[in-house]
């Protein structure tokens, strides 16, 4: 099992100390939720935050792109130090091509689905994925109640 707490709930003025506490508590990775205000109704971290965490810590950074157009940002997050990048099944873009682009940069790949998306929707993408993220809440906000769907 890999413990990968999200830094989304941290005080944005104290991300460095929040990351240090996660590591001290035994986190294996740090999960970085990236939101664009379109795919989900919230905004969060940019590649510069991932770069800052990468420069200060050696822990793997698991970047979750909740973006309408992740293809525009994948290379920037790879360069910033992402260890893995997750994209969503529900986007309109060519998901397979995005996953290939991520892998070509030496970064692990993952695909995610929202709670009501059928699991079999991701079957064609599995050969291109190192991981799968099954959302237990609707993406966009931290601290939600678990959805047993």
Where is each model-derived feature located?
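A short, mixed-charge helix-start or loop-turn motif at secondary-structure junctions
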Residues: 1, 139-140
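Conserved N-terminal beta1-alpha1 strand-loop-helix module at the mouth
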Residues: 1-86, 92-94, 100-104, 108-109, ...
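Short gly/ser/thr-rich secondary-structure transition/capping motifs
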Residues: 112-116
């Amino acid at each position: 099992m890999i413990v990968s707490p999200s830094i989304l709930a941290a005080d944005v003025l104290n991300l460095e100390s929040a990351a240090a506490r996660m590591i001290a508590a035994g986190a294996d990775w740090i999960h970085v939720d990236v939101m664009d205000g379109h795919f989900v109704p919230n905004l969060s971290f940019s590649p510069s935050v991932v770069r800052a965490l990468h420069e200060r810590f050696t822990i793997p950074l698991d970047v979750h792109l909740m973006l309408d157009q992740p293809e525009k940002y994948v290379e920037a997050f790879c360069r910033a130090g992402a260890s893995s990048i997750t994209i969503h099944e529900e986007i309109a873009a060519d998901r397979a091509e995005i996953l290939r682009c991520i892998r070509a940069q030496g970064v692990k790949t993952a695909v995610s689905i929202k709670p009501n998306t059928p699991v079999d929707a991701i079957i064609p993408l599995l050969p291109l994925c190192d991981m799968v993220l099954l959302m237990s809440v609707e993406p966009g906000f931290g601290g939600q109640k678990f959805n047993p769907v």
